[in-house]
Regions:
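Active-site loop architecture of trypsin-fold serine endopeptidases
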Residues: 134-142
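N-terminal organellar transit peptides
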Residues: 1-117, 124, 128-131, 143-298
Length: 298
């Protein structure tokens, strides 16, 4: 009796394991909308650290590239909750999004609390942009900061000697002010990246560059103001963005949704519902002092 019971239970165990795997597969694979989240300050490489929340370009690029060849994924929602960050990292992520579109996938950018500057640059690479009415967006512009710590060094008795191969090799050193030539070099660099940003917005939003420059003075907009200015397509929630993505991709009925993250794909619920708002409604700047010596959007 015990022997037969063991066999029956063993058989049930196999059924449960196989059936369970089939259930998960049926929920994760098929015609899907994938959600990729970009949260916090956008940085080059990997996210800053365990303590400093942000989106590293390496992680975001890996997540996006993992979708490109997945035939079951017909559309992507970019959930953006970021004040911006590195200009180069923002460009790299935007290019990867454009690659998804070239591969035939529809992409909708969904803006959370904040989707400004570098995050807006990324949003412009999508087919559609959806924002909440109170979303903070815009901030189209470029900034670089050169800290001046010379007086602090002197008070602390710190002196430095510089040996350099060329007159500009220590350009931006915190121990001394910029020279006139150095300032002009920085201004030209910022101006060049700014022009690239304007071109990205003008091309994707089908706006004249002159109009974009009127808006691109660093000012921020609410989501509703963004729609009026032509920077955002429509107002709506993340759920609205998911439904829009599914519709653009020709998915019948309510789309099933998977979250794409480093280490795997995760179903977002039997009906593709959102996670509680508290899980996606905040962003934090990295702690400590950041000394940015390259153009950054933020």
């Amino acid at each position: 009796m015990n022997r037969w019971a063991g066999r029956i239970l063993g058989g049930l165990g196999v059924l449960v394991l196989v059936g369970g795997a089939g259930l998960v597969a049926s929920r994760v694979w098929g015609d899907r909308v994938a959600v990729v989240r970009i949260d916090g300050v956008i940085t080059e490489g990997r996210a800053p650290s365990f303590w400093n929340e942000g989106s590293g370009a390496a992680e975001s690029l890996a997540e996006l590239s993992s979708i490109r060849d997945k035939r079951q994924v017909k559309a992507v929602v970019l959930r953006l909750n970021s004040p911006g960050g590195s200009a180069a990292a923002s460009q790299e992520i935007a290019r990867e999004v454009e690659g998804l579109r070239a591969a035939g996938k529809k992409v909708v950018a969904s803006m959370g609390d904040v989707s400004a500057s570098g995050a807006y640059w990324i949003a412009c690479s999508a087919d559609r942009i959806v924002a909440d009415p109170a979303t903070v967006t815009g901030s189209i512009g470029v900034i670089t900061r050169v800290p001046q710590l010379g007086s602090l060094y002197r008070r602390m008795g710190i002196e430095e000697e510089v040996v350099k191969s060329g007159k500009y090799k220590d350009m931006g050193s915190p121990g001394r002010p910029l020279t006139g030539d150095e300032r002009r070099i920085f201004e030209a660099m910022v101006g060049d990246v700014y022009g690239q940003f304007v071109d990205q917005v003008a091309g994707s939003r089908h706006l004249p560059a002159t109009r974009v420059r009127e808006l691109a003075d660093g000012r921020i907009f609410t989501g509703r103001q963004g729609v009026e200015a032509g920077l955002v397509d429509s107002l709506g929630t993340m759920g609205d963005a998911v439904r829009m993505a599914g519709s653009l991709a020709g998915i019948k009925g309510k789309p099933q949704v998977v979250e794409v993250r480093q280490g795997g794909w995760w179903p977002r619920g039997d009906k593709g519902q959102e996670r509680p708002a508290g899980g996606e409604s905040t962003w934090r700047l990295p702690g400590g002092v950041m000394l940015m010596m390259v153009p950054v959007t933020g």
